[in-house]
Amino acid sequence: ERTKYAYIGRSDQQKGLPQPPLELPHDLSRPVIELPRDGLQGTPSLDLRDAILQRRSIRSFVREPLSLAELAWLLFATQGVQHVEGRHWTMRTVPSAGARHAFETYLMIHNVEGLEPGLYRYLALSHRIEQLDTDPTLAHAIAAACFDQQFILRCNAVFLWTAVPYRMTWRYGERGYRDLHLD
C-alpha cells in the first residue's frame, strides 16, 4: 500500500543525485577471463512453441565439461549487454523496468573447459568473467544454501543472481522494490 504513487516522495533521480553504476566495480587484482563473442554460431534455431512444449527439468548431468563458448552463450542469453547508452542505461537480452538491470550474475563453476572450479562474477559490460574464489568448500556452502540439493554439486555451472536494489530505487523510490521483484 505504501508504495502506491500517491504515497511516494521524490526519488533520488528526481532529487538530482548521481546514478548508481551500471555494474559493480571490477577488482583489478583479480584474474579476468575473456569470453568468446561468437557464442554458439552453429546452434540450430528452436521455435518458441517447441521450446515451451519440450521444456523439462532434468537433474541427470553428463560428465563432459561445458565449453567456454557454451558458458559465454548462456551468460549472454541471461544478462548480455547489446547496447550501452553512455553511463545511463544498457539494452540487454532480458527486460528490466526502466532499463535499470539491478541483477548481478555470479557463477559456481564445477566443470567448464579452461576454468578452474570456483566462484566467478559475470562482467556483462565487457563480456568477461572475474574469478572471485577457488576455495573447494565454497561449493558445499552454496549447495547448503540451496537446501542441500546435491545436484548443485554435480552440474557444470550454477548461476547465482543477486540484486543491487539502489539501481531500481534511485529511479523509482520505494516502488523500485516492486519492480525489482518483477524483474
Predicted regions and their residues:
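Short acidic/His/Gly/Ser-rich catalytic and metal-binding motifs that mark active-site loops
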Residues: 167-171
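N-terminal accessory segments that position/regulate proteins before the catalytic core
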Residues: 1-166
